[in-house]
Amino acid sequence: MASRTVSGSDNPTRSRWGLVIAAVLVQLALGAVYAWSVFNKPLQDQFHWSKAQVVLPFEVAVGTIFIGSIIGGRVQDRVGPRPVALGGGVLYALGMMLASLVSSRSQLWLLVLGYGVLGGIGLGAAYITPIAMLAKWFPDKRGLITGVAVAGFGFGAVITAPVAKWLLATLPRKTEVFLPLGLAYLVAILLGASFFRDPPPGYRVPGFVPPTTGRAAAGSRAYTLNEALRTPQWYELTAILALSVACGIAFISQAADAAQSIAHVSAGTAATLVGVLGLFNAGGRVFWAWLSDRIGRMTAFVDMLVLQALCFLALPHARSLVLFFVLGALVYLAYGGAFGTMPATAADYFGTSHAGAVYGAMIVAWSIGGVIGPTVTALLYERTHSYTLPFTVLAIVALVAVALPVVTRMPSEPAPYRTGATPVARH
């Protein structure tokens, strides 16, 4: 069959740029999960849960994201992005609504089940879908566009936090906040995901010739998940993401407390600071993804990790609010950059035909890093009552991680083993 050229401009309502807007809308709703810290104190005050108990729903949500991303990625590659995003969105919103039913201290399990398990799995399925879809639609701007998509996730908490604070101040039972939020998430995801679709067979961007050497891959590889798992590169990329996430989310989990301890600011100032820093998380996803299109993916990861390491070494000595803010902003910027750059990197290395399954499986790095990083940092702080040791350890981890992008190389095409498979063209 002859290749079909689709520029995406024949119908503006179904153009590839329209898909970017739809993807950002979905990611905004999903990124609201990072606003959990807003719920901590109101829930503690009303239900008398401990600190460890009140953060459990969020930890479970982060820990189960990879389940949804693996399942959703595999299913998406078979049935397309729309049903997976819609299904994930419904599960995510249903989890929020279930959490709104919690009415007593003994029902923490229901909050964990709704917000944590159902919400986390639904989030994972809906999160991976627009990333894999846009990687197929934008081979010419793969880094930038996937960065823009996941930037929506970063902005989700920034938008949700003030709304949630207002609702918490007006509702007598604090868990009721999850009902209107869940309904809002559902509407946003259903609206955005209803436009999702994969490009038609033979799709190509007029005038774009995939590079075969240099900084980007040709993208003509067609690795299945099983084939990708047989390469060391899949594990190298997953490790890069896991270590970067562990360092970044460890700081995010302690940012407000660290600002009060190191820079001696008030709790209110620290809360405002964390809200502003969230903008750099979102901005980093776009900036580093865009930059990686120009300087190369691995060079970008080296720069991100070195930047994190230097900031962690300096943070314990940041006695002024301005210096703490600048260093914290750079950490947030690098943390967001890992999420913005890795989807395009995975597509470069393993192609876009099975991008949902391949990158979906890599999301296990998010769950691993998101649990280990904050846990180790909190334990080290409890032992020393200082952030010097925790942040020094994070700096060492980031510096050690630099070795991974330095040694990681493109995989060779796998020998096809599927029945009726044809060899992947080599360039």
Language-model features: locations:
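Hydrophobic core of transmembrane alpha-helices in multi-pass small-molecule transporters
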Residues: 108-124, 242, 323-336
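Extracytoplasmic gate region of multi-pass secondary transporters
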Residues: 36-41, 226-290, 373
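Intracellular juxtamembrane helix-capping segments at the cytosolic ends
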Residues: 43, 124-138, 146, 337-350
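Helix-to-loop junctions at the C-terminal end of transmembrane segments
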Residues: 68-81, 285-296, 381-382
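Helix-loop-helix hairpin linking two adjacent transmembrane segments in secondary transporters
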Residues: 153-201
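C-terminal membrane-cytosol helix-exit motif in multi-pass small-molecule transporters
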Residues: 183-214, 401-409
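C-terminal transmembrane helical hairpin of 12-TM major facilitator-type secondary transporters
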Residues: 237, 247-250, 269, 274-345
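C-terminal ends and interior cores of transmembrane alpha-helices
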Residues: 90-104, 307-319
